[in-house]
């Protein structure tokens, strides 16, 4: 049975494909989920792919993933810039966590330049559109192999 990676998605990502496609691209979250599941299969993982607009739900899922998954890829969306709760939840997790963003957060508005969760994760991938998810899966593959 393959190991599982959780791919968690924060607020407004359910609107991908119609929300600011010039910034976030034209792929829907369902398109990205299909890409992730296909790539993960090639890497030897299963993917548990989830999205919520609610911070507490994301925190609950981080705790769950810390118990069930070998790694976590998270696109915290706007919560990445504000959530101390998610930062603290990630600190309590022993499996590797990779933060990702579709857009280059450092090339956008000043308030998006700082990530509250970045100090708690293994690494951050941003600016590659939907490919950011694939890069995060590869990073997690590398991190899980190193821990063996």
From Swiss-Prot:
Pfam families: DHquinase_II (PF01220)
Ribonucleoprotein among keywords: no
Catalytic activity line of the entry: 3-dehydroquinate = 3-dehydroshikimate + H2O
Binding annotation for substrate: 75, 81, 88, 102-103, 112
EC number: 4.2.1.10
InterPro entries: DHquinase_II, DHquinase_II_CS, DHquinase_II_sf
Function (record text): Catalyzes a trans-dehydration via an enolate intermediate.
HAMAP family listed in its UniProt record: AroQ
Family: Belongs to the type-II 3-dehydroquinase family.
Protein name as annotated: 3-dehydroquinate dehydratase
Natural source organism: Rhizobium meliloti (strain 1021)
